[in-house]
Regions:
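Amphipathic alpha-helical polymerization modules
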Residues: 1-262
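Conserved small/polar residues in nucleotide/adenosyl-binding loops
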Residues: 263-269
């Protein structure tokens, strides 16, 4: 019984430790552009059914409720909470924020398409629009070297002002991706996600089409992490960890008490001659 109780409390320690790790990661990314906070979800482990509901207690009566003992808890997953972050102005023409639904598409080095809310873009030596890491956005948009002014409309049309030209010239169209199940996306680091069978295939459209959001030029989407909320969760996690640790200590004391009592009962009594 004692070792079972210790095991249950240990599962609580492990679960709270995982939750603390997620909270720490949220706080570490409080200033990461486009970062989405995570929330840990718990579930109970299997129950030991010692007496079933309806079990006969006498000739005319039955047990009204079961006697079941839980065996602990575990972390089942960590959901990404894709609520909108604040739009912060940067006055940089190549900074873009998605206000609403949608992800930017980026070609990763391994050939996969990465999806991100981080719109910190720049140009490479060929004029292509890239992320800070140099990954080219998809579909590719090339800005002419002699462009004097760059404009990105709310529906994703990229236009530039060239020397001597009266009107701006359209050079590309930024498209967004969305998914049936955002939480099915697999985060891979560097603010990128990749699609999985759980997320479903990407739905591609221009900004402002259907339920897609709009683009905001000269701005970035800040993290949706609330420091106050994370600190409250941290204190709650710490208290839960301490309680589970205390449970282990209490069970250990109970076992030592039983061991000492059993020793006293089994020791032979010395006869006084």
């Amino acid at each position: 019984m004692g070792t079972n109780s210790m095991h249950v409390a240990k599962t609580g320690l492990n679960a709270q430790q995982r939750r603390m790790q997620v909270i720490a990661n949220n706080l570490a990314n409080v200033n990461t552009t486009g970062f989405k906070r995570e929330r840990v979800n718990f579930e109970t482990l299997l129950y030991q059914v010692l007496r079933s509901s309806g079990e006969q207690t006498s000739a005319d009566t039955n047990l009204t409720s079961a006697f079941s003992v839980g065996t602990g808890v575990r972390v089942v997953n960590a959901d990404k909470l894709f609520s909108q972050g604040s739009i912060v102005s940067t006055d940089n023409a190549l900074d873009l924020a998605v206000d609403g639904a949608g992800f930017f598409q980026v070609l990763l080095p391994d050939g996969r398409i990465g999806y991100t809310r981080n719109g910190t873009f720049s140009r490479n030596n060929e004029g292509a629009l890239t992320t800070s890491s140099g990954f080219v956005i998809q579909p590719e948009v090339v800005i002419p070297e002699d462009a004097q002014e760059i404009n990105v409309s709310s529906d994703g049309v990229v236009s530039v002002q060239l020397p001597g030209a009266v009107e701006q010239e359209e050079v590309g169209q930024i498209e967004l991706a969305e998914f049936q199940n955002r939480n099915g996306l697999q985060p891979i680091g560097e603010s990128f996600y990749v699609e999985t069978t759980a997320s479903g295939e990407a739905i591609i459209a221009n900004p402002l089409e259907g339920s897609f959001g709009k683009l905001v030029q000269g701005a970035l989407e800040s993290s949706n992490v609330s420091v106050v909320k994370e600190l409250v969760d941290m204190i709650e996690t710490q208290r839960a960890y301490e309680v589970n640790s205390k449970a282990i200590s209490s069970v250990d004391e109970m076992l030592r008490f039983i061991s000492v009592s059993y020793t006293h009962l089994t020791l032979p009594t010395k006869r006084i001659v």
